[in-house]
Amino acid sequence: MRTLNTSTMEGTGLVAERDFSFRILTACFLSLLILSTLLGNTLVCAAVIRFRHLRSKVTNFFVISLAVSDLLVAVLVMPWKAVAEIAGFWPFGSFCNIWVAFDIMCSTASILNLCVISVDRYWAISSPFRYERKMTPKAAFILISVAWTLSVLISFIPVQLSWHKAKPTGPSEGNATSLGKTINNCDSSLSRTYAISSSLISFYIPVAIMIVTYTRIYRIAQKQIRRISALERAAVHAKNCQTTTGNGNPMECSQPESSFKMSFKRETKVLKTLSVIMGVFVCCWLPFFILNCMVPFCGSGETKPFCIDSITFDVFVWFGWANSSLNPIIYAFNADFRKAFSTLLGCYRLCPTTNNAIETVSINNNGAVVFSSHHEPRGSISKDCNVVYLIPHAVGSSEGLKKEEAVGIAKPLEKLSPALSVILDYDTDVSLEKIQPITQNGQHPT
């Protein structure tokens, strides 16, 4: 009997030790996630406050709004849930309802800001002239206000009026709801109506809009890349055909295959860029919103096909919040923000780089497909050399359009096509006064 008691005590101690180790690992992982989210989004906000040129671009207003929503996720949502995960119960009592409202509001605001960014970039690429006229700071603030207002309406009003909770079906469940849900944990059961309606507004409708906009952006970029490739091949072909042999006879000339390979490479890079944007977002949030719509339909029978354990649900909740730590890397890691981050962190002085040539592809704020290549010698500040191919009918941003050096740079290729401009210097803008609207066939109107 004494041996049996000793074995039982040893088994209990082993389980407790494993549970303690698991809690420590969980605490470390969640702390790193919260700190990375705080650091990334704080850097974005600090860069915008510190550098005036970042505030001058209307598109960055949406990036700032996204960073604020993600920062609120890291401050108002993540820490409280992390403490509950480590402690094994909800220790904050009646703060539960307010926390649930903050959770829904901040997460919805983050997703809606991502949707607004996708619409903004599509509009800038598809209708650049109209975008320059219509997308003023006032228009940007209106879009941002709509996103935040919708987030508040879908969160605080239903939660404070208890519209979001599922009604208890029996006395025992009612007691558990009134006691356990408030004191022991904060995993409130959503009603079916609220779960579906909030999921539609917070995720399914925005993700559908993002899929449509980014698909169209890729198609526009693909057409422009192929048009540019055709112009490059025509230029090389014409140059080769003008070369003569020693006796004055023209040499045989052929279309270069390298241009086709470069075109395919550029299309692949654009596709990868857009795939990362959508892939990260969908992978982080889709599992949670699927479960969010399934759990309210969890029955009381033996099979319970829509029921899952709380640990699985919490894991996918954290997957969704993790998207807030990745957004600064995806949306605020262009050349402007990278230089601002390097200045804020002192990396120009403390982080010397080796010789390295890096080529990246992106779609900039002006609606252009950008193939950037920068050479970074050791111990010096990196100098970007970007080749920007403007989408047909697209022009540069109106901010700072006073420099005219780009006109001289673009002249050689303007002879090939008035729809094409090449900018070799990142800091050089294209003057709207020097570029006339073009028709569908690529000619200036007469």
UniProtKB/Swiss-Prot annotation:
Gene Ontology molecular function, alphabetical: dopamine neurotransmitter receptor activity, coupled via Gs; G protein-coupled receptor activity
All ranges on the Cytoplasmic side of the membrane: 50-60, 120-138, 219-272, 338-446
A Pfam match: 7tm_1
GO terms classed as biological process: adenylate cyclase-activating adrenergic receptor signaling pathway; G protein-coupled dopamine receptor signaling pathway; positive regulation of MAPK cascade; vasodilation
InterPro entries in the cross-refs: Dopamine_D1_rcpt, Dopamine_rcpt, GPCR_Rhodpsn, GPCR_Rhodpsn_7TM
Principal cellular location given in the protein's record: membrane
Record bears the keyword RNA-binding: no
Segments traversing the membrane: 24-49, 61-87, 97-119, 139-163, 193-218, 273-299, 313-337
Residues where lipid is bound covalently (S-palmitoyl cysteine): 347, 351
Assembly, per entry: Interacts with DNAJC14 via its C-terminus. Interacts with DRD2. Interacts with DORIP1.
Protein name: D(1A) dopamine receptor
Organism: Bos taurus
